[in-house]
Swiss-Prot record:
The gene is rplV. It comes from Thermobifida fusca (strain YX). Gene3D superfamilies: Ribosomal protein L22/L17. This is Large ribosomal subunit protein uL22. PROSITE patterns: RIBOSOMAL_L22. Pfam families: Ribosomal_L22 (PF00237).
Length: 125
């Protein structure tokens, strides 16, 4: 089990945030930060903040070295949807859904991530 950080109610659609999270899953933490820094997607900002928070939590709370950390798990859940009205012609109104996300990133030391995935592979065989 690694160290987690979570950002809730982030005003980015879950579908777009998942595209960014898929880029960093399984990468070393330093490399994942570099990937996010140069990713053109708008969701890379909030995901980068969550990753930085997870790294800081691991360093401060668990006394882990940031060079050994790997993004072991990362996922995006759907938050509540803000419903807005857009006025249209002839007195009509269309609904605009402003979606929110809950972004979670978990980092763990490199040696524990490899052992856990090996155990999972043995169980599935």
């Amino acid at each position: 089990m690694g160290t987690r950080a979570q950002a809730r109610f982030v005003r980015v659609t879950p579908r777009k945030a998942r595209r960014v999270v898929d880029l960093i899953r399984g990468l070393p933490a330093e490399e994942a930060q570099a990937v996010l820094r140069f990713a053109p997607q708008a969701a890379s900002g909030p995901v980068g903040k969550v990753l930085a928070s997870a790294i800081a939590n691991a360093e401060h709370n668990d006394k882990l070295d940031r060079e050994t950390l790997v993004v072991s798990r990362a996922w995006v859940d759907e938050g509540p949807t803000l419903k807005r009205i857009r006025p249209r012609g002839f007195g009509r109104a269309f609904r605009v859904n402003k979606r929110t996300s809950h972004i979670t990133v978990e980092v763990a030391p490199r040696d524990t991530v490899g052992a856990a995935s090996a155990k999972r592979k043995e169980r599935t065989r």
